[in-house]
Amino acid sequence: MGNELRHRTVLLDEAVESLVTRPDGVYVDGTFGRGGHSRAVLARLAPAARLIAFDKDPRAIETAQGIKDARFSIVHDSFASMRDALAARGVEKVSGVLLDLGVSSPQVDDPARGFSFRADGPLDMRMDPTRGESAAEWLARASVQELTEVIRDYGEERFAFQIAKALVARRAESDRLGPLDTTGELAQIVGHVVKTREKGKDPATRTFQAIRIHVNQELADLQVVLDAALSLLEQGGRLVVISFHSLEDRIVKRFMQAHASAPAVDRRLPIRAVDLPSPPLKIISRQFPSEAEVAANPRARSAVMRIAERVTP
């Protein structure tokens, strides 16, 4: 219960206001979490509307089952399954898709989930602990090259190669020391390698982010769900995405820009601009948390919300 109480939904009012353009429409909350956005969306919807939410976390599913509203349903799966899951429910078009990316406060604050370096716990990091490979299992087999690429690309960590070598060296000591399977030891290994310190940031921050993104296939799933959302949105429907680090935001920004721009055509070809297909999206805005929200919830500090609208049928 304590974790539930500590969770604060970021950009709650702004996201819901941007999302709901048709009170009687069909909406998707791709990241139910602890239900802050879903409950606020339901409060704005008409009796005939529908809200379909997704989450991989079994605890989120438990929370969602407490919502006794005939307009609401929850899918225990990644938002990457959105297209097929909605088709199975007879939904061809939606009025809006909301994505609140990243890891939630209850997940970070629970040492047993293995997301945080701030408290020792099992090295898991899976959004759904019942599926897939844990962080410890991946670290037990990954090569120096794979470790380097993941930590460099997903953590933007300049000491990625040195960290990868240290992790493989630690693995060679498994017979004597046992497996590397706790967040505390991982943070300690990274701390010994990363000699420079970013103000206000633990040396292990980037490595933990990178491993979490890899274990959960977060960026690949994000690209899949953006494509799905574009095809599912009806004319006038909104795509609202909240991201918390530059890797996610870059993907969202480029996606929206690419689909809000006219296709590039060789100037030498005899094609008039009016004959080109119209871009499917219009970018509405980019928003950030207010100073008051950041003061009340420091984890909101890095949030960026981007909104786009489908303008073609």
UniProtKB/Swiss-Prot annotation:
Keywords: Cytoplasm, Methyltransferase, rRNA processing, S-adenosyl-L-methionine, Transferase. It comes from the Bacteria. One of its GO terms (molecular function) is rRNA (cytosine-N4-)-methyltransferase activity. Its EC number is 2.1.1.199. It is found in: Cytoplasm. GO terms for cellular component: cytoplasm. GO terms for biological process: rRNA base methylation. Pfam families: Methyltransf_5. InterPro entries: RsmH, SAM-dep_MeTrfase_MraW_recog, SAM-dependent_MTases_sf. S-adenosyl-L-methionine binds at residues 35-37, 55, 79, 100, 107. It catalyses: cytidine(1402) in 16S rRNA + S-adenosyl-L-methionine = N(4)-methylcytidine(1402) in 16S rRNA + S-adenosyl-L-homocysteine + H(+). Gene3D superfamilies: Putative methyltransferase TM0872, insert domain (1.10.150.170), Vaccinia Virus protein VP39 (3.40.50.150). Specifically methylates the N4 position of cytidine in position 1402 (C1402) of 16S rRNA. PANTHER family: 12S RRNA N4-METHYLCYTIDINE METHYLTRANSFERASE, S-ADENOSYL-METHYLTRANSFERASE MRAW. Belongs to the methyltransferase superfamily. RsmH family. This is Ribosomal RNA small subunit methyltransferase H.
